[in-house]
Amino acid sequence: MLLWLGEYLTQFYSAFNVFSYLTFRAIISTLTALFISLYFGPKLIRYLQKMQIGQTVRDDGPESHLSKSGTPTMGGLLILASIVISVLLWADLSNIYVWVVLFVIVSFGIVGFVDDYRKVIRKDANGLIARWKYFWQTVIGLSTALFLYFIAQGPNETALLVPFVKELLPQLGIFYVVMSYFVIVGTSNAVNLTDGLDGLAIVPTIMVAGAFALFAYVTGHVNFSAYLNIPHIALTSELVIVCTAIVGAGLGFLWFNTYPAQVFMGDVGSLALGAALGVIAILVRQELVLFIMGGVFVMETVSVILQVGSYKMRGQRIFRMAPIHHHYELKGWPEPRVIVRFWIISLILVLIGLATLKLR
């Protein structure tokens, strides 16, 4: 929005040309989302406390979690509002990719909101019935995948970029839709599973979003993409603004979500953020790199799959509790230790993911 205003005002005063610089808007997008989160965070927390919108803690989990009961939740509303406002202010709103990501964020946020609303406000322990949750995730994810497939303007936009391999660029065809669906829905649920400790999900999300800002920049830049031998997709440049908005909103939320948390993001935040990372990975053609950089999310999801599968087939559990972060808590690790070590793992994996830009 402000990009258009800046372009108009440039004819009267050349200093407004700064609004056309992507790097400038990326920095301001981060700061805008950060400011919104920090400013409205305390107000939202007080409102949630007043309305008694607090977290319900499982009685079969770690005993240390009992003290978290009643902590305000649905703080993801703050994250989503910060992202959307910042993107609307600083992104080029004529870019269809920007609107695709906003659609996914808001849509998955609505699904998460309904789930949180039923659990926290209507006191329905099950929240949104699982089959309905996955139904709406499927509708949104599949419709997004189909839309992207049909608006693709060239082979670069539907090819699979394989990390560490220079010449391998297989065309996916209609399989692009299937893969995109699983990336969006899978990442959404993976982040949701990871969101079980204070700050555990938001920091890896910030790291991955920050890395994707770089991927979006080089993919959208004709010279950098040629130098790094990655497919050039011009529209991805504006995703830098979306990624930096996620970083800013995430940092602002972390201020209140760090141990001991004053607020939890709830499903409204985790489902939306995960879906956002998924669709951004698809747009910049880095689905496999997301699998690397989001390794903590993958690890949490695999631990649940293994736990459930083992119990159903053998009647035995592999872990003391799943997702795996609870396993380490029950082994006696203090919560901050689990959180920080998972952050360290995430940082290492993000650096490996960034290395794929050059190591081919």
Curated annotation (Swiss-Prot):
Q: Which domain of life is it from?
A: Bacteria
List, alphabetically, the PROSITE patterns matched: MRAY_1 (PS01347), MRAY_2 (PS01348)
**What does the record give as the reaction this protein catalyses?**
UDP-N-acetyl-alpha-D-muramoyl-L-alanyl-gamma-D-glutamyl-meso-2,6-diaminopimeloyl-D-alanyl-D-alanine + di-trans,octa-cis-undecaprenyl phosphate = di-trans,octa-cis-undecaprenyl diphospho-N-acetyl-alpha-D-muramoyl-L-alanyl-D-glutamyl-meso-2,6-diaminopimeloyl-D-alanyl-D-alanine + UMP
Q: Identify the metabolic or biological route this protein is part of.
A: Cell wall biogenesis; peptidoglycan biosynthesis
Compartments where located:
Cell inner membrane
Q: Which CDD domains match?
A: GT_MraY
Q: What is the required cofactor set for this protein?
A: Mg(2+)
**What is the name attached to this protein's record?**
Phospho-N-acetylmuramoyl-pentapeptide-transferase
Q: What NCBIfam families does the entry give?
A: mraY
Listed PANTHER family: PHOSPHO-N-ACETYLMURAMOYL-PENTAPEPTIDE-TRANSFERASE, PHOSPHO-N-ACETYLMURAMOYL-PENTAPEPTIDE-TRANSFERASE HOMOLOG
Annotated EC: 2.7.8.13
> What are the recorded Gene Ontology BP terms?
cell division; cell wall organization; peptidoglycan biosynthetic process; regulation of cell shape
